Amino acid sequence: MAQTINLQLEGMRCAACASSIERAIAKVPGVQSCQVNFALEQAVVSYHGETTPQILTDAVERAGYHARVLKQQVLSSQQTEDRKPVFSAKLVTGLVISAVLFFGSLPMMLGVNIPHFPHIFHDPWLQWLLATPVQFWSGAEFYRGAWKSVRTRSATMDTLVALGTSAAYFYSVAITLFPQWLTSQGLAAHVYFEAAAVVITLILLGRSLEQRARRETSAAIRKLMGLQPQTALVKRGEHWETVAIAELAINDVVRVRPGEKIPVDGVVVAGNSTVDESLVTGESFPVDKTVGTEVIGATLNKSGSLDIQVSKLGQDSVLAQIIQLVQQAQASKAPIQHFVDRITHWFVPTVIVVAIAAFCIWWLTTGNITLAVLTLVEVLIIACPCALGLATPTSVMVGTGKGAEYGVLIKEASSLEMAEKLTAIVLDKTGTLTQGKPSVTNFFTLSPTSTEESLQLIQWAASVEQYSEHPLAEAVVNYGQSQQVSLLEIDNFQAIAGCGVAGQWQGQWIRLGTSNWLTDLGVTGTEHQPWQSQAQQWEKEQKTVIWLAVDTEVKALLAIADAIKPSSPQVVQALKKLGLSVYMLTGDNQATAQAIADTVGIRHVLAQVRPGDKAQQVEQLQQKGNIVAMVGDGINDAPALAQADVGIAIGTGTDVAIAASDITLIAGDLQGILTAIKLSRATMGNIRQNLFFAFIYNVIGIPVAAGLFYPLFGLLLNPILAGAAMAFSSVSVVTNALRLKKFCP
């Protein structure tokens, strides 16, 4: 059986580094798959056989990088922060020295004589002295990275920077040591110490800014982790004590006062309140909580005090599972990333070849070694595989994190990419378009009774039904509670299978059941036209009719059905506006299915479908060329969810359905479908923008650096500009990805 492990990686500088690690792990016997996420600095490895985590980390170490096993535990938000300072001592040193060198080189770069300029800065020996610590101390990480690539027979961005800056530095050293000889050969005795130092400093600065921006891409995870309270008020004997969350056990009872966060998942055993679940589930309205209802840890108790019996802790909690799913999605790769990986694998070697070719061409055609060295340095420095490597994962990280904020959990990056391409969506009726449980939809009484008299009938009905365990009885009780009636103590309760229930209140018999049963008991009015007409109308709508009689007289009718969710019609119309063909899937007969479909605005109805045939219906739509999403919540929906190109599970459904899905809507609100599709389109659009920026930057920058326009316009980049452009490219890609944080469905 295959196992999956997450590794935290250190030492990666660019996408080529990620490719090197991926290849190193893939060579380990027993490894089935490996995905390295450069932006997240993590690897997800599936393996079997005798392979162990230690063998995998050793493989990473041999490749020249560091790895440690990530334990699946919920960390505090502070622990997820990157402790590495944005402005390190090496960067500050580089900034100070580079500023001095740049200032000293201004007259040469501008080609003018500046009066009263301190000419000591022109001294190549001083420039050499100043540039050396930047080259070999501030820039030491580039040399270490380049040496790793030599050992592993690969090439990374560190290779390019080390080669480029070394060429400028050692060329300048040669000019400083042998100026007369070079001048006698007709070569310009210009040094480029400032170029080497400034390029290293700019790249270090770019990496620091990039690191800071990348930290923002994981803000959603830190926000989720920060929701978890650290302490709870727990009952110990006859006393209440404040303890750390880690000290709680299953079945402990905790008390949550108004305005406090609920510390754990559990069941209310005393009290009632409203709870704000928006930060966890995306549900915008407070949810009523009474005895017997479940609560989610990290949600906010609003109005009343609640005593909660702990049911889940640690990794079993809803919040922990949400965090784990978001991390899983952020560590995964979108299919488009595999295309980028193939390019970055050959990118650095290609750039080195182009740089050498530019050097040879300009030296052979002009005999100008300075020009040849400059083009070599500029090509090596301006090329940037980092921008390519960051283009996709940064957008995925922000997009999946944003989805979690709206209660949309995306398991894999591939689901984001596929959701953008959807052409059809299949909605299971029960539990998706409807509430998934019976509820009273209509109450009818013949005589013109007052509101008080109607409420009394509802109170009697709910009071009798409270003693029954039948699902229809629960619907009547819930209806009574929604009308805010209190339940009475009923005497002589009776339940007759297939007929109904009865009980006495103050000597009166109250009966609820079928018309035939009431007729057999001598109740009058069951055959009267007004009652029969209303009952027949509801039965045509596939509603269950319950007759309410007091003593020997019919008093009211109740209709019970699986009510349509209020948001269903609106969501269906919105899906159509997004260009999707909407289908309803149900086991109901055609007439019943069509009535519900007409109510919510669905034209395509797949009725009388047996549970085992749902996946086949999805497959038939796929065979017609559709990219299909399936939305469901039940066990019998799991095969169809797995068959669909994108399976979307309603979070209020079964664990089996959620496990088989690609996207989970935590709150169970259909609005989450729209959020998921709109988010996928926004994320994929952002990825394409990033890839365009990264590709166009390299496609234009490398030829310009190689001197393509020099013969026509005398245009040749300064190495400093090349370094600045390279640093800016990565920062711009990450900054563009951060725009997704403003996404609003």
UniProtKB/Swiss-Prot annotation:
Residue positions of the active site: D428 (4-aspartylphosphate intermediate)
Any GO CC annotation of this UniProt entry: membrane
Biological process, per Gene Ontology: copper ion homeostasis; copper ion import
Domain HMA intervals: 3-68
Spans within the Extracellular topological domain: 116-125, 174-193, 366-372, 565-687, 739-745
Transmembrane parts of this sequence: 95-115, 126-145, 153-173, 194-214, 343-365, 373-390, 544-564, 688-707, 720-738
Side Cytoplasmic, residues: 1-94, 146-152, 215-342, 391-543, 708-719
Binding sites annotated in the UniProt record for Mg(2+): D633, D637
Subcellular localization: Cell membrane
EC nos: 7.2.2.8
Keyword Magnesium: yes
UniProt keyword terms in alphabetical order: ATP-binding, Cell membrane, Copper, Copper transport, Ion transport, Magnesium, Membrane, Metal-binding, Nucleotide-binding, Phosphoprotein, Translocase, Transmembrane, Transmembrane helix, Transport
Domain of life: Bacteria
CDD domains documented for this protein: HMA, P-type_ATPase_Cu-like
Catalytic activity as recorded in UniProt: Cu(+)(in) + ATP + H2O = Cu(+)(out) + ADP + phosphate + H(+)
Pfam families: E1-E2_ATPase (PF00122), HMA (PF00403), Hydrolase (PF00702)
Keyword ATP-binding attached: yes
Residues annotated to bind a metal cation: C14, C17
GO MF annotations in UniProt: ATP binding; ATP hydrolysis activity; copper ion binding; P-type divalent copper transporter activity; P-type monovalent copper transporter activity
Record's bilayer topology term: Multi-pass membrane protein
Functional description taken from the UniProt entry: May play a role in the osmotic adaptation.
UniProt record similarity statement: Belongs to the cation transport ATPase (P-type) (TC 3.A.3) family. Type IB subfamily.
Protein name per the record: Probable copper-transporting ATPase PacS
Name of encoding gene: pacS
